[in-house]
Amino acid sequence: MSKPLVSVVTPVYNGAAFLSNCIESVLRQTYSNWDYTIVDNCSTDGTRGIAQTYAKRDNRIRVCMNDVFLDIVANHNKAFRLISPDSKYCKQVSADDWLFPECLERMVELGEANPSVGIIGSFQLCNDHVAWLGFEYPKQVFSGREVCRRIFLGGERTFGFGSPTSLMYRADLVRLGEEFFPNPSPHADTSACFKHLQNSSFGFVYQVLSYERSHTATETSRSKDLNRYSSAYLHDLILYGPSYLDKQELAQQLKKNVQSYHRFLAVNYFVGFRDKEFWNYHEKRLEELGYPFNLIALLKATGLAFCQAVLHPGQAIGKMWKRLSHTSWRFKTQPSPPGLETSGDKLKDRKLSSPPQNLR
């Protein structure tokens, strides 16, 4: 097998608690042709010193220190822009995650054997359970259309692209634009997959190759509290859905997801005791996405949710428990320095116009 260069990146803010474990996991790779860029986002907890110590020990490691604090997705995109011009693959590892020793070797092996593959995933250990079990062994290469359709059409919970630490990207995809993660939402890594799998295949290695640490300090608590993920998924469905679904399928999925979004808001309106920030956020996002929030939609969603709960109480409780138990948060927390807030979900990549009437 050829040994193409892999550029590994770790964007980090105040990651001193686990950064050494992360870096050591890269150093222990059985695949040796890599370089490693750590982008320190104005950390205040010793992160910089840890990274610089390792950079002095191994010349494949370099540390880039931001002059100003960036929001979390912007820092990821800066890291992607810093990959080597000679690299063929790009591997991200979050600062509180780590890689198993064969991670780079197994992923490169699949990529080299299948030139059509642009993104490569694998099983991942998330705390005490294995994630991303929805692919069917022994098939290793899936068309981008096949994978994205399955997700947009409501694939089972165990099916998905993976988290940033569990994926490897072909470097040519990363270099296609200024921002590899195409929007500032907590779902941006998934958006990147939807975007780039329009013209490439998805590969999957049936081996646990990475570990994702999930704990209170790493969850993007503000995004979790506001539930930014519903609007981010609806954004992806509007923007990328037409590439993978026919008109009827797209209309059905848009209707289903908007109704689900409205039910979520209805429940919070009557029992959630949400503050003004919550309502301002969702009103603005729905307006941007072409589905203006209105009281009639809220009342309809409330009535539907109530009827479902009365007629099928077991189902309602089960759905609620499933949603609470299996929510996945995409990005690691990056608290803002005093006086500086991270950016919201303003659509930077393109302005979305209202969907056609037949899709509402």
Per-segment meaning from a language model:
Residues V141-Y233:
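Conserved nucleotide-sugar donor-binding catalytic segment
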Residues N14-R28, W34:
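Short, well-formed alpha-helical segments that are part of the catalytic scaffolds
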Residues E102-F135:
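Conserved donor NDP-sugar-binding/catalytic core segment of glycosyltransferases
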Residues K3-V6, L27-I38, G46, N59-R62:
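Short loop->beta transition adjacent to catalytic acidic/histidine clusters or analogous donor-positioning motifs
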Residues N268-R360:
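Membrane-interface aromatic/basic loop that binds lipid-linked glycans or pyrophosphate carriers
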Residues D86-D96:
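Short beta-strand-to-loop acidic/aromatic patch adjacent to the donor-nucleotide binding site
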Residues S25, S32, D40-G49, V68, ...:
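A conserved acidic beta->alpha catalytic loop
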Residues N66-P85:
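Glycine-rich, basic loop-to-helix element that forms the pyrophosphate-binding segment
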